[in-house]
């Protein structure tokens, strides 16, 4: 997996910031792992051109908010490279349904009929999974494939190069990345995960979306319009 791979495009600001990562042994091993998995007939999500969609949709200089997920959805047609988001025409997954419930409670935002979060990403919400690929029907299957050093570096880059961001850390996996974030520079908001297993243990009622926008406005930034159009 090299940054001149014709199938894998990376937005210019991220390519510059992450250039050294693509030459490191772990990244070469990761690329070889993915090639071998595909050669063995395994179905990998998301499709190759969408693996870096979070970075390509939200250039480094545009980042205002970071939401950290775990790995892509593992069902056909769901994942498109943005954490918690699904492609148009796909039913809204349970965790995202709870995110919408909290948005509705917190900011009175109508619940859309889809789970397509592209509009958030275009406004500066970096929707970053810590593993950028997964095997079909096998959640967490690429958790140890080598993505962690890469996505850790993404978090380090936004921590170092951006000012006054909001990091939304939902659940223990996302919160394990807190050590990469400077709390003097950025606002870190933590709660339970929006999964149905944990949403009622502190996610619903966390007020993270209004708190995010208040912080952005206090720091001279345009708040996020969290509303999404019906499709």
UniProtKB/Swiss-Prot annotation:
Catalytic center residues: 71 (proton acceptor)
Catalytic activity, EC: 3.2.2.27
Function: Excises uracil residues from the DNA which can arise as a result of misincorporation of dUMP residues by DNA polymerase or due to deamination of cytosine.
SMART domains per the UniProt record, alphabetical: UDG, UreE_C
Keywords, in A-Z order: Cytoplasm, DNA damage, DNA repair, Hydrolase
Subcellular location: Cytoplasm
PROSITE patterns xref list: U_DNA_GLYCOSYLASE (PS00130)
Reaction catalyzed: Hydrolyzes single-stranded DNA or mismatched double-stranded DNA and polynucleotides, releasing free uracil
Entries under SUPFAM superfamilies matching the protein: Uracil-DNA glycosylase-like
Molecular function terms, GO-annotated: uracil DNA N-glycosylase activity
Entry's family note: Belongs to the uracil-DNA glycosylase (UDG) superfamily. UNG family.
NCBIfam families: PRK05254.1-1, PRK05254.1-2, PRK05254.1-4, PRK05254.1-5, ung
Name the UniProt record assigns to this protein: Uracil-DNA glycosylase
One GO cellular component term noted in the UniProt record for this chain: cytoplasm
Organism, as annotated: Pseudomonas aeruginosa (strain ATCC 15692 / DSM 22644 / CIP 104116 / JCM 14847 / LMG 12228 / 1C / PRS 101 / PAO1)
Principal location class: cytoplasm
Pfam families: UDG
Example GO BP: base-excision repair, AP site formation via deaminated base removal
Alphabetized CDD domains for the sequence: UDG-F1-like
């Amino acid at each position: 997996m090299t940054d001149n791979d014709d199938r894998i495009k990376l937005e210019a600001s991220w390519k510059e910031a992450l250039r050294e990562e693509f030459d490191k042994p772990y990244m070469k091993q990761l690329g070889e792992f993915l090639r071998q998995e595909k050669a063995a007939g395994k179905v990998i999500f998301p499709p190759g051109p969408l693996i870096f969609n979070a970075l390509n949709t939200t250039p480094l200089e545009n980042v205002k908010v970071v939401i950290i997920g775990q790995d892509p959805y593992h069902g056909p047609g769901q994942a498109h490279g943005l954490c918690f988001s699904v492609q148009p025409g796909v039913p809204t997954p349970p965790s995202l349904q709870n995110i919408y419930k909290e948005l509705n409670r917190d900011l009175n935002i109508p619940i859309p009929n889809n789970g397509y979060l592209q509009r958030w990403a275009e406004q500066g919400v970096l929707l970053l999974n810590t593993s950028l690929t997964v095997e079909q029907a096998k959640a967490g299957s690429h958790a140890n494939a080598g993505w962690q050093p890469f996505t850790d570096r993404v978090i380090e880059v936004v921590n170092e190069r951006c000012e006054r961001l909001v990091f939304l850390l939902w659940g223990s996996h996302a919160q394990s990345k807190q050590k990469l974030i400077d709390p003097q520079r950025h606002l870190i908001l933590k709660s339970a995960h929006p999964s149905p297993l944990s949403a009622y243990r502190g996610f619903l009622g966390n007020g993270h979306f209004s708190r995010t926008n208040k912080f952005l406005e206090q720091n001279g930034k345009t708040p996020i319009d969290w509303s999404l159009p019906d499709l």
